[in-house]
Each structure stands twice: as structure tokens, then as C-alpha cells.
Amino acid sequence: AAGYLSDDFIDASFDFYGRAMSGKQEQKPRWKRAMSVPNSTLGEAVGEMYVAKYFPEKDKARMLEMVRNLQTALSQHIAGLDWMSDATKAKAQEKLAAFTVKIGYPDKWKDYSTLTIDPSESYWQNIKAASLWGTLDNLRKFGKPVDKDEWLMSPQTVNAYYNPTTNEICFPAAILQ
């Protein structure tokens, strides 16, 4: 919470976490820190706007086709390996068939309709509201099956990942620009 409070708290927090723990020489200007908040608290909402402007559906379709072609080529390569036993090939093909591909942006956007950001409230009150909403959103998932379609990155993130525990790749729209 220190990052959202007065300069005294922000500076003390940076002195410890930024300088002492991370070796940073200076913190980002306040305006840059403030501009990063919507991205971190409303990632998919910002991502939806980003995608509408910069990543048309045809680009997603083209990337999905390219990945499917790579999967087909890899499947053929596995089938032709002479050093791999038939049982191991079958397991490799099974894993390849179960591979999850996330390209560009989610097929279903996160619903933020229960989150209220009130311009008449203080910045801190709105940060608390967003934090509470995020916590409740996570608690709603408790005891339910894992949503394998949920993204761990927003579309405007310039990064990509392979998650071996879920056997998925994710290439957000921004990394594909």
C-alpha cells in the first residue's frame, strides 16, 4: 500500500525495496507509476482497448494457423524419430495434442462490471476498491475447476511464456507487433 500513499511512505518504501533490495538508483516519476496502475489493476480492460486499436482478428487467425502448422510439423518429426520408443512417441504425441495455445488475447474478456471506480472518491479509495475486487474475483474461483482459458498476462504485455505445468504457450498481442 505504501506506493499509493504520500511521498514519505513512497520514499521509505523505495529506499528499502528499490534501493536496498533491488539495487535501483532512482524510482520512476510519479506520473509513470500512476500510469502503470490501470494496467496492473484492470489489465484485460486495458488489453481490450489495446487489441481493438492494434491487433485485428486477422492477425490472431494468422498466428494461430502458424502455430498449428508448427504443431503438425513437430508431430511428423516425432513420428519419424528412430531413437524414441513407440511408447515414448505416443506420450509425446499425447502431450502435443493436449498443448494449449493462447495467442493475442483471450477469447472471453474478464468481466469488470462489478468493479466501481468513482472519480469523486480519492485515489486511495479507488485503489482499495480495485484491490478488493481483485481479491473477491480470486476467491470466487476457490473450490472450482481451474479455468484453463484464463490468461496470466494481459494482451498489452510485451512478453511470452511456456507454462510446463499447464502445457501452454502464451503470446500476447503486444509481443507480436
Give the residues covered by each predicted segment.
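Structured mid-domain segments that build the active-site/substrate or prosthetic-cofactor binding neighborhood
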Residues: 1-41
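Intrinsically disordered, low-complexity linker/terminal regions across diverse proteins
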Residues: 28, 39-177
